[in-house]
Design a protein with these regions (language model features):
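Short glycine/serine/threonine-rich phosphate/pyrophosphate-binding segments
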Residues: 14-15, 77-80, 104-109
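Short phosphate-binding loop-to-helix
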Residues: 68-90
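General beta-strand structural signal in soluble alpha/beta enzymes
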Residues: 27-30, 70, 125-128
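Anionic-ligand-binding alpha/beta catalytic cores of soluble enzymes and soluble regulatory domains
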Residues: 94-137
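N-terminal beta-strand-loop-alpha-helix module at the start
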Residues: 1-60
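Long, charged alpha-helical interface segments
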Residues: 136-204
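Histidine-anchored nucleotide/phosphate-binding helix
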Residues: 32-37, 83-84, 111-115
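Active-site/ligand-binding-proximal alpha/beta "capping" segment
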Residues: 82-94, 99, 170
Length: 204
C-alpha cells in the first residue's frame, strides 16, 4: 500500500519525523506547501485556490517541476477535498495529514466531517501538534503505560469495547459525540478498542 502525504494550510507544529522517501506522492494544499519546504520536503503537487500561499514561494514553485492545480476561490469543495480527489484510488493508499492546526474553527470541524464521510477513513492518519489522530472501527495498538488518549465517536457506536485502559468498557453503545470516552489513560502496553458497528476517532 502506497503512502500519500497531504500538508494542509494553517499552523503545523508536529515534530513527527517525516522523510520524503516514505511517500509516493506529496501534496501541498495552498500555504500548506510552506510546511513542506520548511522540512526540506518538495511536493510533487501544489493545489488549491492559492489565496494564502506566500507569493514568493509560489513564484519559486513555478520554476520547479511541481504540478500546480489552481482553482477558483468560489468553489463547492474545500482545498482538502480537492487534495483527496486528486489521489488515484485512495482506498488503496495510506494517507497522512499534517497542518490544519489552530485555523478557523469551521475549517477544523469540516476536516473531521469530510474524513468521516469517506469509506477509506481508516486509511487516514493526522499528525496534529504533538498528537496522532486516527479513524478506526477496531484497533489493537501498542501504547506506553500511563499514556493519555481520547476516543471520539464519529458515528453511533454499537457494543464498544475498551481493554488495556484505566476506564474500560464492555460492549457499551455510545451516541455520536459522546464525551464518555474522553481523557482516558492506558494501563497496559497494548490498548484494544473494538465496536460491532460505527466509526471512532482515536487521539493519542
Amino acid at each position: 500500500m502506497k503512502n500519500i502525504l497531504i500538508s494542509l494550510g494553517g499552523n503545523c507544529s508536529t515534530n513527527n519525523d517525516l522523510i520524503k522517501e516514505q511517500f509516493s506522492d506529496i501534496i501541498g494544499v495552498d500555504n500548506g506547501a510552506q510546511h513542506l519546504f520548511n522540512r526540506s520536503i518538495t511536493p510533487n503537487v501544489v493545489l488549491g485556490d492559492l489565496d494564502s500561499i506566500d507569493p514568493s514561494l509560489l513564484k519559486q514553485i513555478k520554476t520547479m517541476e511541481i504540478d500546480i492545480k489552481s482553482y477558483d476561490s468560489n468553489k463547492d469543495k474545500t482545498d482538502f477535498e480537492l487534495a483527496i480527489d486528486s489521489i488515484n484510488k485512495p482506498n488503496d493508499k495510506k494517507i497522512y495529514l499534517i497542518g490544519g492546526e489552530e485555523g478557523e474553527v469551521d475549517h477544523l470541524f469540516s476536516i473531521f466531517s469530510i474524513i468521516s464521510n469517506y469509506e477509506f477513513a481508516e486509511n487516514l492518519t493526522w499528525f496534529y501538534q504533538d498528537k496522532t489522530i486516527i479513524f478506526k472501527r477496531n484497533i489493537s495498538i501498542e501504547m506506553k503505560k500511563g499514556s493519555r488518549f481520547s476516543i471520539i465517536p464519529i458515528t453511533n457506536l454499537k457494543h464498544l469495547k475498551i481493554t488495556g485502559a484505566e476506564w474500560e468498557l464492555n460492549e457499551e453503545d455510545l451516541n455520536s459525540g459522546s464525551s464518555k470516552t474522553l481523557r482516558n489513560i492506558s494501563n497496559s502496553d497494548v490498548l484494544k478498542i473494538s465496536c460491532e458497528s460505527g466509526l471512532f476517532c482515536l487521539i493519542y
